[in-house]
């Protein structure tokens, strides 16, 4: 019993230690486009200004706002920094040749989560490649959770990949894409995203904490059977899944578009309200409806990963299916770990009088902090 209690308390201690930052992860967007003829490819690399500020410093006057003038003044240094961390090789008839990255210009663009530097360059290969090998090393020394989202466009085919610290290189055909590899990449990305999306995890825990108990006569009482608890879990998790799948699909297809700050603030608010409902139970019997309503907001947060890739057609379908499947796998893993432990402790005073309210207080405090920093300019 003490071991189980320590494990459960450790979950919240870890959450407190690692969840001070806002939800949106560090991503860059790299696009390589092969024309119908010739050996060269066009490259475009969108890198968040906040990441470049962290890496080399852009805010010359220290006012917290990076202007186009400040970015332009450091343009050559930004270009050198980025391109030195990207290697492209062309493969044709079994021969592998290094391709030269020739910078062209730099622009500014606004993504859903803020400003980005847009580096445009040419990938000059000795001969027209049938395959490309890409090695990506941007920001991993500063943020091992950084992701590079690679979109490759060739005549008749598009494909997308996710590059990470543990998977910095990828090799692919330009003419005949490996769709299964793309699907696997986005399944992995979905799993990573839910396990690193601490606000999503804590909202899920606010749904799972009461699953093994009932609020009757002014207090929490243990459910009588595991079947009853599992049915409650099935209802709330299914509702949450359906809801965030709907808004994820709508947002990635451009049918819903809300400012990132509004979405991230809304997610923090859902976590706070979920925690408060565990402390002061108002919604008791229809928690699945709450899970559905709040899940719509969480889906918009998931969409931030894919929305800026500009995918379409089969490429978009694979990314959506894979990413959503990965999110569900991650959620299922959390449920499978948490519910057996919670069910085993449900009859103890520790769970009903200490862990549930204590966990709700910790989650609520974190959510209130997130809400404050996300609403603030």
Predicted regions span which residues?
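Bacterial N-terminal signal peptides
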Residues: 5-15
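Membrane-interface motif at the C-terminal end of an N-terminal transmembrane signal
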Residues: 17-21, 373
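Hydrophobic alpha-helical transmembrane segments in multi-pass membrane proteins
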Residues: 189-377
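N-terminal soluble domains immediately following signal/targeting peptides that reside
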Residues: 20-195
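Generic extreme N-terminus detector
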Residues: 4-5, 26
């Amino acid at each position: 019993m003490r071991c189980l209690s320590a494990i459960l308390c450790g979950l919240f201690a870890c959450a407190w230690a690692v969840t001070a930052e806002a939800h949106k992860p560090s991503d860059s967007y790299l696009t390589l486009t092969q024309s119908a003829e010739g050996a060269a490819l066009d490259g475009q690399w969108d890198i968040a200004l906040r990441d470049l500020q962290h890496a080399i410093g852009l805010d010359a006057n220290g006012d917290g706002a990076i202007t186009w003038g400040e970015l332009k003044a450091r343009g050559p240094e930004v270009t050198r920094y980025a391109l030195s961390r990207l290697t492209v090789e062309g493969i044709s008839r079994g021969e592998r040749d290094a391709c030269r990255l020739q910078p062209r210009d730099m622009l500014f663009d606004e993504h859903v989560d803020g400003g980005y530097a847009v580096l445009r360059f040419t990938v000059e290969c000795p001969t027209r490649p049938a395959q490309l090998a890409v090695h990506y090393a941007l920001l991993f020394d500063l943020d091992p959770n950084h992701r590079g989202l690679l979109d490759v466009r060739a005549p008749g085919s598009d494909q997308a990949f996710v590059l990470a610290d543990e998977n910095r290189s990828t090799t692919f055909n330009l003419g005949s894409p490996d769709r299964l590899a793309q699907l696997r990449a986005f399944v992995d990305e979905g799993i990573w995203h839910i396990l690193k999306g601490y606000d999503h995890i804590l909202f899920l825990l606010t749904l799972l904490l009461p699953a093994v108990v009932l609020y009757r006569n002014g207090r929490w009482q243990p459910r009588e059977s595991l079947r009853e608890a599992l049915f409650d879990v099935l209802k709330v998790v299914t509702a949450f899944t359906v809801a965030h799948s709907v808004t994820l699909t709508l947002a990635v297809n451009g049918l819903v578009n809300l400012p990132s700050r509004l979405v991230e603030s809304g997610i923090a608010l859902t976590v706070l309200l979920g925690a408060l409902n565990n402390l002061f139970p108002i919604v008791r019997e229809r928690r699945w409806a709450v899970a559905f309503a709040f899940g719509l907001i969480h889906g918009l947060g998931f969409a931030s990963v894919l929305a800026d890739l500009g995918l379409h057609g089969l490429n978009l379908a694979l990314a959506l299916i894979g990413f959503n499947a990965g999110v569900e796998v991650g959620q299922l893993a959390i449920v499978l770990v948490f519910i057996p432990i919670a069910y085993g402790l449900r009859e103890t005073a520790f769970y009903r009088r200490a862990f549930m309210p204590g966990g709700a207080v910790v989650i609520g405090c974190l959510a209130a902090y997130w809400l404050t920093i996300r609403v603030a300019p």
